[in-house]
Amino acid sequence: MLDLNFVVQNLPSVIAKLEKRQQSFAYLNKLPLLAQQRKSLLLQIQNLRSQKNQSAKKVAQKANAKEDIALFLQENNFLRDDLQKLEQKLKLQEQEIFDILSITPNLPHDSLPIGTDDKDNKELYCEGQIRTFPFTPKDHVYLAEKLDILDFKRASKISGSGFVVCKGLGARLERALIQFMMDLHSKKGYQEIIPPYIINEKSMFATGQLPKFEDEVYKLYNSKNNWYLNPTAEVPTINLHREEIFKPGTLPIKYVSYTTAFRQEAGSAGKDTRGIFRQHQFNKVELIQFCHPQNSYEYLEQMLKDSEEILKLLKLPYRVVLLSTGDLGFSMSKTYDLEVFLPSYNCYREIGSISNSCDFQARRANIKMKNPKNNKNEYVHILNGSGLAVGRTVIAILENYQNQDGTITVPEILQSYLGTDIIK
């Protein structure tokens, strides 16, 4: 969430920056008047409280002196009623301000290319060699069904479209990737986390999923607790420290979190809905970091390298892309996408994102640090990154490591995890 005072004091530049996202933010022009009215109400309330306190003292003094207090009680009651009306008016005023700020996204970083969507993203560099096949490569669905390691038909019978059953070496490959990713990131100083998969409304708001993206998540409607299914490990892991203040010397704090994620994926169509590229339920390893504001962009670059190492060790060809302002996520100031080459698409497709939300999510979640220089509480910066999306990594392995006979060579780094060098 953006800071009200910052927005009001810098309104023209804030709107100009936000409109690089190719949306209109004219509604923010309401904020200066609302902020002024709020300030005026606060002063009136402060004055009335002072008058009410003075009136209460008079009542007490008159009562102690055995004098008639009827008129003073009446005055006190009038002041009480006026105060309640003003407090209610202030509550409505603050709710209107809150509602405006809660639907306003983060400011995009100045380094981002200006654009309308992913077509305007900027390729930074490519890594790895794209394989030249001596045969026509098959897609992951064909390969997996022939090997009987992914079962879409029975998953559809159980749950409907957008789900899969992993079987045999398919299940072992999924599990091996999760363990490999968790092991690698743990060695780099990330603490392992397996959080709850059911999340409350406050947690969803804190990371920016609510209220804007309610249609994209699953809500448990039979619950009295406003529970949601986890849409990404970012949500529960960041909320570990909601309403907390970090002591001096404790930052940065780094987590690697494994969860199953659940998303509606409404509006998805075409080739992306075939197979496991875009599922309602999928496994994901996520990196989260809480850090000092001065270091957040330095740590963003390191987190990118940490995620890249997974692809390098798996020897998968990939590229790094800087998201344009029009493709940038709601809560993020800057995002890199990792895109792996998929032969069936004959192009690079997203396998992970690494982002800096600066203090945007920290404000929504009220996560602060104690600054030892001035002993004041300040908002931390929060980074998150994929480390990686497991299902899409499975796709990349099946397609890039396929053989002409339909078998799959297991990447060398995974062979000890999987207990075999080939899937057949």
From Swiss-Prot:
The UniProt record lists the EC number as: 6.1.1.11
Q: Which reaction does it catalyse?
A: tRNA(Ser) + L-serine + ATP = L-seryl-tRNA(Ser) + AMP + diphosphate + H(+); tRNA(Sec) + L-serine + ATP = L-seryl-tRNA(Sec) + AMP + diphosphate + H(+)
The record's listing under InterPro entries reads: aa-tRNA-synt_IIb, aa-tRNA-synth_II, aa-tRNA-synth_II/BPL/LPL, Ser-tRNA-ligase_type_1, Ser-tRNA-synth_1_N, SerRS_1_N_sf, SerRS_core, tRNA-bd_arm
Classification via Pfam families = Seryl_tRNA_N, tRNA-synt_2b
Its main subcellular localisation, reduced to a broad class, is cytoplasm
Can you tell me which residues bind ATP? 263-265, 350-353
Q: State the superkingdom.
A: Bacteria
Which key words are in the record? Aminoacyl-tRNA synthetase, ATP-binding, Cytoplasm, Ligase, Nucleotide-binding, Protein biosynthesis
Q: Name one GO molecular function term.
A: ATP binding
**What does the record give as its pathway?**
Aminoacyl-tRNA biosynthesis; selenocysteinyl-tRNA(Sec) biosynthesis; L-seryl-tRNA(Sec) from L-serine and tRNA(Sec): step 1/1
Stated role: Catalyzes the attachment of serine to tRNA(Ser). Is also able to aminoacylate tRNA(Sec) with serine, to form the misacylated tRNA L-seryl-tRNA(Sec), which will be further converted into selenocysteinyl-tRNA(Sec).
What does the entry note on its domains? Consists of two distinct domains, a catalytic core and a N-terminal extension that is involved in tRNA binding.
Assembly mode: Homodimer. The tRNA molecule binds across the dimer.
Question: Of which family is this protein a member?
Answer: Belongs to the class-II aminoacyl-tRNA synthetase family. Type-1 seryl-tRNA synthetase subfamily.
From the Swiss-Prot or TrEMBL record, give the protein name.
Serine--tRNA ligase
